[in-house]
Amino acid sequence: LPICQMAIGHNRYSTAGSDSVLDAQPVSAKYSLGEISIVHNGNLINKHEVRERLIEDGAIFQSNMDTENILHLIAKSKKENLQDRIIEALEQIVGAYCLLILSRSKMFVVRDPYGIRPLSIGRLKDGGYIVASETCAFDLVGATYVRDVAPGEMIVFEEGKSAFKSIELFEAKDPRLCAFEYIYFARPDSM
């Protein structure tokens, strides 16, 4: 994407799929509304059904990762704006996910309705924001913890705006944070 005030830094421990460079994230593409990049932490349990439906509709996949399913769902949507396309795509997937979707001027952050994977927002000293699955990432850039993204919530950051917008996409379910987050995946200095 062109130079802007937003960026993606992503390091994911793959628990499913291949370790091929084709399955590295972010996944980026040009589509009818412009350019987007997506990173995803989690697993979609209906990924095979969604992929088969997309292939039947003419989608061509470049990887084996379930993140690409989300990209195709967004790209094929007929909704007028990216936010509505993301919402429509999320209504078709089932599983554990934290997503960050970056366009030219907006960044969308979404957490699944069960809150299976952690996702937090931090504030940089210059007023900018950082989003990470582990709060120890904030320490590395001098950011302070603001809050967690709630289960079922979408956060929208817009270039040039100092505040972010919160949208309750899905009613939060009984929280089901993955036990492995704190005993295996996460660093001990993360909240």
For every predicted segment, state its role:
Residues 1-151, 156-191:
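Conserved short alpha-helical segments that host acidic/polar catalytic motifs at enzyme active sites
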